[in-house]
Amino acid sequence: MNMIDPFGRTISYLRVSVTDRCDFRCTYCMAEDMAFLPKKDLLSLEELDRLCSVFIEKGVRRLRLTGGEPLVRKNIMHLVRQLSRHLDSGALEELTLTTNGSQLSRFAAELADCGVKRINVSLDTLDADKFHQITRWGHLDKVMQGIDAAQAAGLKVKLNAVALKDFNDAELPDMMRWAHGRGMDLTVIETMPMGEIDADRTDQYLPLSLLRASLERQFTLTDIPFKTGGPARYVHVAETGGKLGFITPMTHNFCESCNRVRLTCTGTLYMCLGQEDAADLRAPLRASEGNELVADAIDEAIGRKPKGHDFIIDRRTSRPSVSRHMSVTGG
């Protein structure tokens, strides 16, 4: 069974935000004094497993756990181990997660044991002081130890860096060399107008077309058709032998090939990262021990999936395109 939206796109990728909490407070993702969801509003790990399983029955082939920081959710490995049965059965092709890396020293080996093959680590700078500045609470050495642990466990690591003008743009070439030297791909992401937007956010916006032009003065970049199921467009870097990805929601949106939906830890389904329209799956999930009601709610929601997002960086307004913080939906 496949889920097909009104524009003929097959929905095969589910991103699940298992918590809105995080041990960092990255400036583009969260307010420093974030008010978190009360625990009673959260789906239990068992409910998350049940919901994910319904999506898998309906054709989801790739499942990514996100946050917040997914590895700070209490007993998260119980959910990972439960979901891994779908890898064993062949129903799910891939189970992966996006993490800030702070908890990887603790969990990397168990993730690998559960059948996770690759992970994404969000890392915007290799400068310890700048790292603390952008994450507010984070420590770079802990993340580096986590990356070491992940690679030692056999996990393939890809780095995600948000490109921020006058913050990390000058060091992105060195980050790429470092990542490729360790066998990791790097993907750079345009900052998106979500949550609280101040002057810094619009001033830090860097179109990746400019970054690519700058990189092409130093490196030989060749477009390649490589895909991981996400929106990144990849180039091969001749000088390093590695892959560099660009995620460009602002300057070259990727909506025409969108294959994903996003589920939050409260059971809210967002059909698009850049739209406010959502569907409540918690109520139908809890209304019956069977899955018919929630399956019908999913079908109805997929039927409302929009053609594209509404992101725009507008210096004339401080109003974000989307009012919720990235940490709520899972970046």
UniProtKB/Swiss-Prot annotation:
Known InterPro entries for this protein? Answer: Aldolase_TIM, Elp3/MiaA/NifB-like_rSAM, MoaA, MoaA_NifB_PqqE_Fe-S-bd_CS, MoaA_twitch, MoCo_biosynth_MoaA/MoaC, rSAM
Q: Which HAMAP family match?
A: MoaA_B
What is its cofactor? Answer: [4Fe-4S] cluster
Where along the sequence do coiled-coil regions lie?
none
Q: Which UniProt keywords apply?
A: 4Fe-4S, GTP-binding, Iron, Iron-sulfur, Lyase, Metal-binding, Molybdenum cofactor biosynthesis, Nucleotide-binding, S-adenosyl-L-methionine
Pathway assigned to this chain's UniProt record: Cofactor biosynthesis; molybdopterin biosynthesis
Question: What residues does [4Fe-4S] cluster 1 bind to?
Answer: C22, C26, C29
The molecular function terms of the Gene Ontology recorded here are: 4 iron, 4 sulfur cluster binding; cyclic pyranopterin monophosphate synthase activity; GTP 3',8'-cyclase activity; GTP binding; metal ion binding; S-adenosyl-L-methionine binding
Query: Which positions in this protein are listed as binding GTP?
Result: R15, R64, T98, K158, R260, V261, R262
> What SUPFAM superfamilies does this protein map onto?
Radical SAM enzymes
Record Gene3D superfamilies: Aldolase class I
**Assembly and partners?**
Monomer and homodimer.
Query: Start and end of every Radical SAM core domain?
Result: 6-231
The name on file for this protein is GTP 3',8-cyclase
| Keyword 4Fe-4S (UniProt) | yes
Q: Per UniProt, where does [4Fe-4S] cluster 2 bind?
A: C255, C258, C272
What does it catalyze?
Answer: GTP + AH2 + S-adenosyl-L-methionine = (8S)-3',8-cyclo-7,8-dihydroguanosine 5'-triphosphate + 5'-deoxyadenosine + L-methionine + A + H(+)
Function, in words:
Catalyzes the cyclization of GTP to (8S)-3',8-cyclo-7,8-dihydroguanosine 5'-triphosphate.
Kindly list the positions annotated as binding S-adenosyl-L-methionine: Y28, G68, S122, M192
Q: Name one Pfam family in it.
A: Fer4_12
The cofactor remark states: Binds 2 [4Fe-4S] clusters. Binds 1 [4Fe-4S] cluster coordinated with 3 cysteines and an exchangeable S-adenosyl-L-methionine and 1 [4Fe-4S] cluster coordinated with 3 cysteines and the GTP-derived substrate.
State which Enzyme Commission number(s) the record gives: 4.1.99.22
From what superkingdom does this record's organism come? Answer: Bacteria
Q: Which GO terms describe its biological process?
A: Mo-molybdopterin cofactor biosynthetic process
